[in-house]
């Protein structure tokens, strides 16, 4: 069966961690694997890091820059050189490619989100492999994807992928960094319920030239599996592992997918929008929205965190801070704070008007099923 496959390769796998020099042998092996997947009829997307590292090498810069403007300029230098290498290698195998540069605000706008989906579908029909990266040159720091692990998971959700492979500098997920703790236990398979509860010392940062550590890969796994995408982590310098995992071999760490929602708009609410704040709920509200499919009312809200406006996205959390759902609010954070814990009929008297009886209508509310099930079934 033909499948849609997203592969993300990190800077640590593409380059030497000390010098930033590209590992052409790894890139060539990756290109060969992706071309084989495409020749077999699969739809293939590559999310490639490395632009900043390659740019630093090209300009003789020894350390990854910290200033945003400098990093964006260096990314512009590196992205062109990186794409030239990919194009040369894919062309030698007769495989056409396309470059897609995304920013978070584009995916937050529903029309742009749909346009991006349509572009990917058109490329698939043309037999093209899309190579994706964040458009660092114009990205706003506060609205960046943050790392390509997150970007790859969001792309996988957007295009309704079957698989997301994250290629990194370790062979699988461990209970701690195996480079620092040799006794760290390997983790072969993670269910949605286990992922919701997973708490390990995964490290907070990546290599010198990259931005993503194992913690970002777990965050990506939560996004991808919640969107119905199977995800695997495996060693980046062995791209052939992708084919072996798809053939059923027990390599790397595999994260089991949840059932995918058929509602494309709700997938956009869950993963396309960037939450601007948090709303904490009492037990009754949690049961009503998670088990009863109800809208969120003011009465069930105990706390509001962050500043946001009406029509923006927020996270819905239990009292311990675990995220249960996401939704688009009908009121601002200030207004919700004023009406929290009150019955809906009091909204007009408290605010002087009533924009809606609900804080979040159920049509604009998405349950993140594994976490909500875990929370509501607790104790």
Swiss-Prot record:
UniProt: substrate binding residues: 49, 136, 148
Pfam families from the UniProt entry: AA_kinase, PUA
Keywords: Amino-acid biosynthesis, ATP-binding, Cytoplasm, Kinase, Nucleotide-binding, Proline biosynthesis, Transferase
InterPro entries the record matches: AceGlu_kinase-like_sf (IPR036393), Asp/Glu/Uridylate_kinase (IPR001048), G5K_ProB (IPR041739), Glu/AcGlu_kinase (IPR001057), Glu_5kinase (IPR011529), Glu_5kinase/COase_Synthase (IPR005715), Glutamate_5-kinase_CS (IPR019797), PUA (IPR002478)
EC number, UniProt record: 2.7.2.11
Reactions accelerated catalytically: L-glutamate + ATP = L-glutamyl 5-phosphate + ADP
Pathway participation: Amino-acid biosynthesis; L-proline biosynthesis; L-glutamate 5-semialdehyde from L-glutamate: step 1/2
Disulfide bonds: none
The PUA domain, residue ranges: 276-354
GO cellular component: cytosol
Function: Catalyzes the transfer of a phosphate group to glutamate to form L-glutamate 5-phosphate.
Protein name: Glutamate 5-kinase
Organism annotation: Microcystis aeruginosa (strain NIES-843 / IAM M-2473)
Gene this protein is translated from: proB
